[in-house]
Amino acid sequence: MKVGVIGAMEQEVTLLRNQIEDRQTLSRGGCEIYTGKLNGVEIALLKSGIGKVSAAIGTTLLLEHCQPDVIINTGSAGGLDPKLQIGDIVVSREVRYHDTDVTAFGYEPGQMAQCPAAFVADDQLIDLAEKCIHSLNLNAVRGLICSGDAFINGAEPLARIRATFPQVTAVEMEAAAIGHVCHQYNTPFVVVRAISDVADKESHISFDEFLAVAARQSTLMVNAMLATLSKDK
């Protein structure tokens, strides 16, 4: 099995990249893909860049050039579920856009025209993440992750998202685009991110301070998932 792992930012991929054996680098379209082996599993690690367009371009390049069997999206997220604290884990059951609106044509909020309302994560990958969460004794929430081209900072955008998507657990800027591309390519995916900030009026300060914590925690999860896949081969 070949696993594609996607992070948006340098801080979100550097720990994993440094662990890859026999690493090679492919640069395309402003993205970097690092291939090799990690924990006995063939891996293609993408640094996509920030935002939905960068994530979609990078995911497409990753799928076309490396043809991974599954995709894991790692990195940081802003927590909206009250049970989430800095460093906790959020696992996608589904992902949606929070900044898409074609409701005038009968679509649901966040649903792109001619697309599903949500992009649903793979059950087996969710189960794998759950197994690793249990073995690592981490606090985690599973549910809806919403994506948009905005860093959510302040009461007004936060209230809008919560009103529109009452079940939302976390927000970030790439996961729905990654899920969208995986849907188009019929490739199983899951989003496993660590909380860098709790989405409120001070979230930009928290993000800067705790991004490294989120990077360590999300890397810990990816390593555990790869190690489990290696044992199950």
Curated annotation (Swiss-Prot):
Substrate binds at residues 78, 152, 173-174. The keyword DNA repair does not apply. Catalyzes the irreversible cleavage of the glycosidic bond in both 5'-methylthioadenosine (MTA) and S-adenosylhomocysteine (SAH/AdoHcy) to adenine and the corresponding thioribose, 5'-methylthioribose and S-ribosylhomocysteine, respectively. Also cleaves 5'-deoxyadenosine, a toxic by-product of radical S-adenosylmethionine (SAM) enzymes, into 5-deoxyribose and adenine. Thus, is required for in vivo function of the radical SAM enzymes biotin synthase and lipoic acid synthase, that are inhibited by 5'-deoxyadenosine accumulation. This is 5'-methylthioadenosine/S-adenosylhomocysteine nucleosidase. The active site is at 12 (proton acceptor), 197 (proton donor). Pathway: Amino-acid biosynthesis; L-methionine biosynthesis via salvage pathway; S-methyl-5-thio-alpha-D-ribose 1-phosphate from S-methyl-5'-thioadenosine (hydrolase route): step 1/2. One of its GO terms (molecular function) is adenosylhomocysteine nucleosidase activity. It comes from the Bacteria. It catalyses: S-adenosyl-L-homocysteine + H2O = S-(5-deoxy-D-ribos-5-yl)-L-homocysteine + adenine; S-methyl-5'-thioadenosine + H2O = 5-(methylsulfanyl)-D-ribose + adenine; 5'-deoxyadenosine + H2O = 5-deoxy-D-ribose + adenine.
